[in-house]
Amino acid sequence: MMSPTLMILISITTMAILSGESFGAMPAQCNSEFLEELPPRLRKICVAIARIWDAREMNDFVDDREYRENLPRYDSSVKRQDVDHVFLRFGKRR
């Protein structure tokens, strides 16, 4: 049976990996300075990680841009003229 300390350490490590916190940055070995010195297989892995990283950043950018574009724009100087605009009143009757 495992000791409680080891079990806690394994649990924390697993949660960090699953939540993506441990993948916050590119590995130091994938730095462009060291990339030429790496074996071909590790170079392929670094390229794959870089592509995933770029796709993730692009998705975050697109999601953020779509969110900002869908925010309502209020212009208080112009009153609405459309017929579809209806004011509803909720609360006690007088």
Swiss-Prot record:
Expression tissues: Expressed throughout the nervous system (at protein level).
Record PTM Pyrrolidone carboxylic acid, positions in chain: 81
Propeptide: 25-80
Modified residues (Phenylalanine amide): 90
Major location category of this protein: secreted
Task performed by this protein: Myoinhibiting neuropeptide.
Annotated protein name in UniProt: Myosuppressin
